Structure formats: structure tokens, C-alpha cells
């Protein structure tokens, strides 16, 4: 963010700290769950705080993303987060604070559908993703609208055990 700062906490780090214009973030999930072999939800503790366009004592752009949830189902991967941000007014005015819960930040299509099995399972997007909602664009002051701001994603999860098979829903006829 122009004329700004960034701060990361918890399970979030920038693997390219020397060149923040080309940031490459690493998210380490604190917990995860799955209900089937092609579905998972991973939760990341930590925050991403960005400030930019400082005027006086305040920043025109000031937002904190937190409570990250990465949801995968089949070939669809979506990143959700809470965001606390200043509503954009203009380049010289710090707007009122706004809050939005679990907005879709970004979305990607995976190269292959998720297939969980016991052990390490890797996944990768089929190229860059895109912003997931108007909410995230608003939180960024409507400055960053195009998809180049959501890079490709890769990841690995450690699955502790096989997912049980989906229970059968067919019922046997009763003898009554």
C-alpha cells in the first residue's frame, strides 16, 4: 500500500519481507476439520494490518484482516476473514471505522480436486485467484480492483486419519 506500513501477527508471515511489493504470504493453520475426502476447512490465527496514504495523524487506508478461514471443496478454494477498516472517503480524509465478518477475501480454482487421505496432502491453484467479493474491495478503499492482487496459492495439510465413508441414506423396506 502506497506510503504505508504492514504488520503480520500469529501464523502469518511474509516470505519476501525484503520486497513487500512482491509479498508472498505463508499462513500456518492452527486447526482444521473435514467432513469428506474432498472438503476441508482450515483456521489461521493471526492478523494482517495494512495502513496507507497517511494524512496528519491518520491513514486513509487502515485495515486489519483476522480470523482467517480457508475453505476447500472439490476444486474450489475460498479464503474468508473478518475485517476492521476505515471507509474510504477521499485521499485526504480518514473515514469512519467499519467492520465486516467473514467476507470472502479471495477465491481460486485448484489444478486438481482436493483428495484427502492420511498423511501430507498438497494442493495448488490453477494460476492466480481473484478477489472474492465487493466487501474486500471496499475494505481496500476501492483502490485495488483487478485480479492481479491475488496471486496463485499452494499449500499442504497433514491429515491425521482417513475420512470415514459417507453414510448410506437408502433405507431398507420394513416388514410391517
Task: Report the location of each language-model feature.
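Extracytosolic secretory-pathway proteins
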Residues: 1-32, 41-43, 49-166
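Ser/Thr/Gly/Pro-rich low-complexity, disordered linker/stalk segments of secreted
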Residues: 162-176
Amino acid at each position: 500500500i502506497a506510503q504505508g506500513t504492514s504488520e503480520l501477527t500469529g501464523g502469518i508471515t511474509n516470505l519476501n519481507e525484503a520486497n513487500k511489493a512482491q509479498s508472498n504470504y505463508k499462513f500456518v493453520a492452527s486447526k482444521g476439520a473435514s467432513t469428506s475426502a474432498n472438503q476441508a476447512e482450515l483456521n489461521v490465527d493471526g492478523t494482517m494490518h495494512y495502513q496507507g496514504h497517511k494524512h496528519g495523524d491518520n491513514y486513509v487506508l487502515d485495515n486489519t484482516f483476522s480470523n482467517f478461514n480457508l475453505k476447500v471443496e472439490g476444486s474450489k478454494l475460498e479464503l474468508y476473514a473478518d475485517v476492521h477498516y476505515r471507509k474510504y472517503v477521499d485521499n485526504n480524509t480518514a473515514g469512519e471505522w467499519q467492520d465486516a465478518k467473514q467476507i470472502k477475501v479471495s477465491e481460486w480454482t485448484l489444478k486438481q480436486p482436493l483428495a484427502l487421505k492420511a498423511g501430507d496432502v498438497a494442493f495448488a491453484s490453477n494460476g492466480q485467484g481473484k478477489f472474492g467479493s465487493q466487501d474486500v474491495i471496499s475494505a481496500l478503499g476501492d483502490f485495488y480492483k483487478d485480479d492481479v492482487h491475488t496471486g496463485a496459492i499452494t499449500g499442504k495439510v497433514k491429515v491425521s486419519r482417513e475420512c470415514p465413508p459417507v453414510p448410506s441414506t437408502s433405507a431398507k423396506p420394513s416388514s410391517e
